[in-house]
UniProtKB/Swiss-Prot annotation:
It comes from Aspergillus clavatus (strain ATCC 1007 / CBS 513.65 / DSM 816 / NCTC 3887 / NRRL 1 / QM 1276 / 107). Residues 1-10, 42-54, 202-212 have a biased composition (Pro residues). The lineage of its organism: Eukaryota, Fungi, Dikarya, Ascomycota, Pezizomycotina. SUPFAM superfamilies: Leucine zipper domain. The gene is kapC. Coiled coil: none annotated. This is Putative transcription factor kapC. Residues 101-124 are annotated as: Basic motif. Putative transcription factor.
């Protein structure tokens, strides 16, 4: 009994297996290209594993060629179906986000913004110019007020000087001077010439000293009064004369007052009295 040989494979089955292999290779190349061009995007899911009878392997193809088409049925005639990758989830990067504006619309917006900026700048410049003019007028007004103030100050100083001239205030008198009481002429006797001349004069006779005693008593009292008046005058003037000037002043006033003194009737004047002279023992001339 001879073994039966399997019929030759149908040419349509060979072409379908070759097409399936080409399709799988094309899918792998497409996936590799997408991975290189868009590394950030998620990888597409790999195709589901094919059943062993659909894998394009050489021994399987030979086995399939040896299978009777009546036994395999219409499954082999239909050919393998490869699942198509779902590309709906992948979005183009160009369409992501907002819609890009057109060039003409963007240029119009830029022109409008520049126009608004120029208007604001011109308004601000006009405002600053107005403020500068106001400051200039204010500075001129301040200068005029300062000049007027200086003129008024000079006028006030002149008025004060004239007021002081017209008032003529007199300084107050010291407390120890009273000008309300009348002051009469007080006779002042002449002072003695010197100590040497008085010591050399001898004692007059007993009758002569009794006559000039009233005159000497009268001369001592005016001398005290004159000294007190001189002290009052010096205190009122606020100054004191030197001792030499004061002695000369007292001597002159004493001589003038002595001339005015008139002795009683029947009594000789003090200037008319003559005293006997005696020569000194030392032999020097006397100085009167």
């Amino acid at each position: 009994m001879q073994p039966t040989l399997a019929p030759a494979p149908h040419p349509s089955m060979q072409t379908s297996a070759q097409d399936h292999a080409d399709q799988v290779l094309h899918d792998q190349l497409l996936a590799a290209h997408q991975h290189l061009s868009h590394p950030q995007q998620a990888r597409p899911p790999p195709p589901p594993p094919q059943p062993p009878h659909m894998q394009p392997t050489t021994p399987v193809a030979r086995d399939q060629n040896n299978i009777d088409p009546a036994i395999s049925g219409g499954a082999m005639l239909a050919g393998p179906q490869t699942p198509q990758p779902d590309l709906s989830g992948q979005e183009s990067p160009k369409t992501y986000g907002k819609r890009p504006l057109s060039t003409s619309k963007r240029a119009a917006q830029n022109r409008a913004a520049q126009r608004a900026f120029r208007q604001r700048k011109e308004a601000h410049i006009r405002d600053l110019e107005g403020k500068v003019k106001a400051y200039e007028t204010m500075g001129e007004a301040i200068k005029a007020l300062q000049a007027e103030n200086y003129q008024l100050r000079e006028y006030i100083i002149n008025l004060q000087s004239r007021l002081l001239d017209t008032q003529g205030e007199v300084p107050e008198l010291p407390g120890n001077i009273d000008l309300s009481q009348p002051r009469g002429d007080i006779p002042v006797p002449a002072p003695p010439t010197s100590g040497t001349s008085t010591s050399a004069v001898p004692v007059p006779p007993p009758t002569a000293p009794q006559q000039p005693q009233p005159a000497q008593n009268q001369a001592s009292a005016p001398n005290d009064d004159m000294n007190s008046l001189n002290r009052i005058a010096v205190a009122g003037l606020g100054m004191r004369k030197p001792p030499t000037e004061e002695a000369n002043y007292l001597g002159n006033s004493f001589q003038q007052q002595a001339r005015r003194v008139r002795p009683d009737d029947g009594q000789p004047d003090a200037s008319e009295l003559t005293l006997p002279k005696q020569e000194p023992t030392h032999g020097l001339p006397l100085i009167s």
